[in-house]
Amino acid sequence: MYYNKIRWEKGVITIEKINKKLRAERLKRNLTYEDMANLLGYKSRSTYMYIERGFTEPRLEVMKKIATIFNKPVSYFFNLKV
């Protein structure tokens, strides 16, 4: 079983579940990869695209920014009950 640096626990949360939520929230707001990259201060749309597609693991600071853009708590993306 593959675990990334955060050591996701099997069956609790996976990077794929986070990615699906990121994509769903972005599409719900009719935002493109380029829009998200601009909102996050990235020069290239591929930087955000790599996060959403799971090629790059997002840092907590990035997840906080994304949560703010989507008006969601960070815990929403991790299925945490706070």
Regions found by a protein language model. Give the residues of each.
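Residue-level detection of the helix-turn-helix DNA-binding "recognition helix"
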Residues: 27, 41, 52-55, 82
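Short C-terminal boundary/hinge segments that cap the last helix of small helical domains
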Residues: 60, 68-82
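Residue-level signal for the short linker/turn that defines the boundary of a DNA-recognition helix
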Residues: 20, 30-31, 43, 58-61
